Amino acid sequence: MSEVKKIATRDSYGNALAELGKEHENLVVLDADLAAATKTGVFKKAYPERFIDCGIAEANMTGVAAGLSTCGKVPFISSFAMFVAGRAFEQVRNSIGYPHLNVKIGTTHAGITVGEDGATHQCNEDIALMRTIPGMVIINPADDVEARAAVKAAYEYEGPVYLRFGRLALPIIHNESSYKFEIGKGEILRDGKDVTIVATGAMVSNSLEAAEKLAADGIEAKVINIHTIKPLDEELVVVAAKETGKVVTVEEHSVIGGLGSAVCDALAMKNPTPVMKIGINDTFGESGPAVELLKKYQLDAESIYEKIKNFVK
């Protein structure tokens, strides 16, 4: 049996930018001295005249992008999630969010799967921060196919978009020939009647694996992929909650303010349902291999399976 192909979504980001650059001369890419890591170097090599390296000055990069967007350009700013959502939050809020400018924020190295770089570089709070900015779209793709489609959709969308990419290579779960991406629309990847698993980003493939383990125990889990955390596909989540009666959210992010909180907000208003949030439990990350960190923070498939099995019982 052949192995499932795996690609890091940061690679998908760089490749998608280069592809879009062929078609759209108004697309410009800005980076903060991390083009090799964020993979925007692919775009830089193809279109050096449309690439701006702002150095280690993320706040300035954000302001430059805001200015470019008022001149007919569609800028994508790029750095680690910690350095844009964290360090440059004020500028993202005031220079991009407040005037609702057409700037795309492509961040990489989100979550604990940054690995050996450690807690200072592992941004587990970015989704929570970005959710508070009015009008900010938040996309967290699950694989290469979805990530490349998300970059294209972000370019076509008029307004600020926050894109979250990772360092860890992820299994490809979508068929490129048939996959259709739409901002704000989740998808059911697996049907089930006993519990609904709502997952995002790197946790989608682990959740699918956990669902297979649950099935062996006679527990049928519905698995929903939420690539767009804001605006959330509330209708899909509410209908699923009504069908299964229990919901589990899974994210490589703090359980405070991320996907789990968004789902709970929706269900509290429209269909109160027991919810278990699986994510980073109000703690910082640490240095270590990505796969080992997922195990320690109980975000690997086996841990997800065990938690859901106990929750359903």
Where on the chain are the PLM-derived regions?
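Thiamine diphosphate
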Residues: 1-164, 169, ...
